[in-house]
From Swiss-Prot:
Record lineage: Archaea, Methanobacteriati, Methanobacteriota, Methanomada group, Methanobacteria
Species of the source: Methanothermobacter thermautotrophicus (strain ATCC 29096 / DSM 1053 / JCM 10044 / NBRC 100330 / Delta H) (Methanobacterium thermoautotrophicum)
Entry membrane topology: Single-pass membrane protein
Entry similarity comment: Belongs to the MtrF family.
Name this protein carries in UniProt: Tetrahydromethanopterin S-methyltransferase subunit F
Gene, per the UniProt record: mtrF
Record field: transmembrane: 45-65
Length: 68
């Protein structure tokens, strides 16, 4: 008959489980970040275009019209 220990050494198993949890969280975080970037892509391009028009277009129009 084989005698089994009452307290098996499971430190290695716990370490592997923690590593798997950590890696899973990293993969999930990257997936959520990428999904958020894709979802806000169009609005970000539109806001950037409008900001560029304001920063470049308004002073150009003012100099053409002779206001400045």
């Amino acid at each position: 008959m084989i005698i089994l220990s009452n307290k098996p050494n499971i430190r290695g198993i716990k370490r592997v489980v923690e590593d798997i949890k950590y890696r899973n969280q990293l993969i999930g975080r990257d997936g959520r970040l990428f999904a958020g970037l894709i979802a806000t892509r169009i609005s970000g391009i539109a806001i950037g275009f409008l900001l560029a028009v304001l920063l470049v277009g308004v002073p150009a129009m003012m100099s053409i019209l002779g206001v400045i």
